[in-house]
């Protein structure tokens, strides 16, 4: 953890008082489960807290930044900013992926590079930072890491895959597109949804995500990739 502490201090001017909070934020459930006798805490509860403070800070920012945007437009942009893929990218940008503790099986299966794990890690770090330093320190960190990307319009350029799929298919004729939840797993604060996209009665593709909306976007993205190969 010394290297992680040095990274945070040198890159972001962050120094944790409670080192246990920081260690917990970087401990995946798979690692804790493999070391049950040591009674190690994992980062799911911190992830829950981090998700909440992230939503609040980004919502406040968008409300102030875009006074003429509708609630729907702001919600869509916020969803893009805080989606799993985006948060995983921020974890990589901060080099957090190098420091997460994973179980052996998760490590071997490529968990260190998985968006789901890295997105959760970013939220867990925010939760730990909130408890250790307060919301203003979380806001300062996000102003360093996330907000510059928002200011550059990065997230406004992200594709709405459902709309792209609908436009592509309807250009070929009048079709009915439907999204159905196949499975719902995980605890209440860390759900994982699997969704299928159907065209009429034909199963086109599947996708996963931490919400139904994200899973639908992933399914539409996979469907577009599949159709491009035809």
Swiss-Prot record:
The keyword Cytoplasm applies. It is found in: Cytoplasm. Coiled coil: none annotated. Residues 5-134 form the RNase III domain. Its cofactor is Mg(2+). Its main location: cytoplasm. Its EC number is 3.1.26.3. The active site is at 51, 123. Mg(2+) binds at residues 47, 120, 123. Residues 160-229 form the DRBM domain. One of its GO terms (biological process) is tRNA processing. GO terms for cellular component: cytoplasm. InterPro entries: dsRBD_dom, RNase_III, RNase_III_dom, RNase_III_sf. One of its GO terms (molecular function) is metal ion binding. It catalyses: Endonucleolytic cleavage to 5'-phosphomonoester. PROSITE patterns: DS_RBD, RNASE_3_1, RNASE_3_2. HAMAP family: RNase_III. PANTHER family: RIBONUCLEASE 3, RIBONUCLEASE III. Homodimer. Belongs to the ribonuclease III family. This is Ribonuclease 3.
